[in-house]
Amino acid sequence: KDYRTLSLEMLAQQLGFNKNYLGNLIKKETGDTFKQLLQRQRMLHARHLLVFSNYSMEEISEEIGYLDTSYFFRSFKKTHGKTPGQIREEALHRDL
């Protein structure tokens, strides 16, 4: 789950597939490109970390492969409709 270095090329090499073949197979089976699939997994992992860990926003951003925390915030809000801070705050209030 190292989102910082995961790439279609690396995955194809590990599986013994041609990069283009694997990309087309992923698109056919999921309806999403590898990049879209990876982005969704990153955001799901970030949400999990926000709810179930005490990691800082910067640590979460880095953990899922974003070097720019503000870009992570924008991507997260675009995906979830809420900021990372809002998700964490809701999780904290739910546990009370």
Q: Residue spans of the language-model regions?
A:
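…primarily DNA-binding HTH/wHTH and HhH modules…
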Residues: R74-L96
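Short helix/strand-capping hinge loops at secondary-structure junctions
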Residues: K1-T5, T33-F34, P84
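Helix-turn-helix/winged-helix DNA-binding modules
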Residues: Y3-R4, Q14, F52, I64, ...
